[in-house]
Swiss-Prot record:
Keywords: Calcium, Cell adhesion, Cell membrane, Cleavage on pair of basic residues, Glycoprotein, Membrane, Metal-binding, Phosphoprotein, Repeat, Signal, Transmembrane, Transmembrane helix. Residues 54-615 are extracellular. Residues 1-18 form the signal peptide. It is found in: Cell membrane. Glycans are attached at residues 255, 399, 437, 455, 536. GO terms for biological process: adherens junction organization; calcium-dependent cell-cell adhesion via plasma membrane cell adhesion molecules; cell migration; cell morphogenesis; cell-cell adhesion mediated by cadherin; cell-cell junction assembly; homophilic cell adhesion via plasma membrane adhesion molecules; Notch signaling pathway. The chain crosses the membrane at residues 616-636. It comes from the Eukaryota. This is Cadherin-6. Three calcium ions are usually bound at the interface of each cadherin domain and rigidify the connections, imparting a strong curvature to the full-length ectodomain. GO terms for molecular function: beta-catenin binding; cadherin binding; calcium ion binding. Residues 637-790 are cytoplasmic. Residues 19-53 form a propeptide.
Amino acid sequence: MRTYRYFLLLFWVGQPYPTFSTPLSKRTSGFPAKKRTLELSGNSKNELSRSKRSWMWNQFFLLEEYTGSDYQYVGKLHSDQDRGDGSLKYILSGDGAGDLFIINENTGDIQATKRLDREEKPVYILRAQAINRKTGRPVEPESEFIIKIHDINDNEPIFTKEVYTATVPEMSDVGTFVVQVTATDADDPTYGNSAKVVYSILQGQPYFSVESETGIIKTALLNMDRENREQYQVVIQAKDMGGQMGGLSGTTTVNITLTDVNDNPPRFPQSTYQFKTPESSPPGTPIGRIKASDADVGENAEIEYSITEGEGLDMFDVITDQETQEGIITVKKLLDFEKKKVYTLKVEASNPHVEPRFLYLGPFKDSATVRIMVEDVDEPPVFSKLAYILQIREDAQINTTIGSVTAQDPDAARNPVKYSVDRHTDMDRIFNIDSGNGSIFTSKLLDRETLLWHNITVIATEINNPKQSSRVPLYIKVLDVNDNPPEFAEFYETFVCEKAKADQLIQTLRAIDKDDPYSGHQFSFSLAPEAASGSNFTIQDNKDNTAGIFTRKNGYNRHEMSTYLLPVVISDNDYPVQSSTGTVTVRVCACDHQGNMQSCHAEALVHPTGLSTGALIAILLCIVTLLVTVVLFAALRRQRKKEPLIISKEDIRDNIVSYNDEGGGEEDTQAFDIGTLRNPEAIEDSKLRRDIVPEALFLPRRTPAARDNTDVRDFINQRLKENDTDPTAPPYDSLATYAYEGAGSVADSLSSLESVTTDGDQDYDYLSDWGPRFKKLADMYGGVDSDKDS
């Protein structure tokens, strides 16, 4: 290939270079108005006329990928102002000037210093100018020219993908489109055949072919079967130079997969299947599974199962398991071994998705025979009915037979059966059953008005196998008997005005009856015989199970008779006739002109409920006595004397003890002001304490005396409680108020002891100067240092 490139280069250089002339762009600003032209001569595909110009150019085409050891000559720059004395300097600027292209500033020769690649940059635009060396001014306007890079076939075709993936349905016709591959060539498509790509297949025949110009891959073999071979690898070559010898080429791989079509019917691996199931299997119980195989995949391998014919067409069913594609045989109806022991079915497997163009391959279904054998099971007794409904009159006597139930063993053995009542459904044991024949009879009296329906359960059990039992519901309806008399629907109490007129309606009566006669209720109303004669009221039956009470005379006097009690007889028309007597209370009241009641007799409206006058007086006296007792107790409690705090004949202020062995001064014997202890209000402001070390003499603060009625004991108890609950209380030092000893005291304050410091830090020699009272204390603390020294 390198030899070929050299050949092209030599061929190009050896060609005669025709000359042409063309005007180039000129920049005239800054120059005298003198018309100048440039003359360029060099390589060109067309021969042009030559004319004299200010510039002469020998070459403007370069071959790419030049591999010579010397710089590649581009052309020569010359100005007609150049006299050959070196007074002019040639300058080159533009694309690649000084790097890719250099110019001899004396001769104007231009050379390429590096190997150029047309695919990187096909055209370079440069500018040339001649400058006077002495003045540094241009002698010609700057002119622009172009260097074009000629293409050579140095790039092979490259596919857009290294590996292609494609699919095509199996059994496709010849020429079915599969995929299109594309390769690109970086060479110049406008120059020669360097970029003209031709496709060919290197691997994959005779199954596939490729169009040389488009790169479209098509099927080349008829009826390719996925079940025989699914994957194909095809290698495609793209070659430039129109596929001629010496062209560059590239390859790509195309992985082609045949997709499935439904071209295979399902097939049972065997023609006959046999299963067993007990006769006690409930509907929906699976018996067995059958499976047909299909060489296809996906939805083309889906199978539907159905029972097409056979003795058990109505007794069994088949459903399809969508995950395993199996047919599940299930029980459709209850089986009976005693009736039929063996069933034969024909099960068919078919594809739900069939392509019509493959029907010529045959029917896409298969069938198999399934034999089902029913196994005998010891079954519980079976009642002749699913439920029983019986009736009985509510006046039936005990042990009256209502009806019977029947059950028998369905097995061939015909085991005997006994009957019983489930007592959970008959807690009151109202009914009983004959265990031998199933007769139902009463064991207690019935009442329809208490319970109309009795729902009980009867159990039938095999005598030889008590585990085998069955149940049946029994509904017993109690028939009505006219055994309840009618009665008022409510308690009737009404009134009549004193000025009422005769035949005036004062009350409408209604009745109810607990019985439920077949023809409905029909009540009749009348006054009791003892009240029918001489009554001040009459009753009128409305023939609609209601009646009205009317006045018989004009005017009533409530002072003579305030209340009338009317006995009313209510009867039904059923058999036997039942009747009852109800009382209607009629009160005589004063009414206004519109007939509205205003007032009745006190006994008629208000019952004397409450306490008598004597009882009220007694209760009032008890309350007064209790109040007096409470008042006296409170007064005595307030006047009770308080115990003294200190029982002493001495003055409470004499709390400074006088010693006879040492005369005290006036300040020692003078009683101090006790107001400090008896003024809690003054001390209340200084409850918060701060622990400090006293640094100066404590000056006692005089507090005015407290009020005489201040209880000192209560104050001391209060202070004691506060100190007990105060977390800042001693043993550590704090400012406190002590009894004032006078200004002449040797120990200014107890705080001067500074008990917070350690014994080693104290000098107790001054205790011996305090006098005989502190002699013992001075001996105790004064010997500490001597003990340590010893």
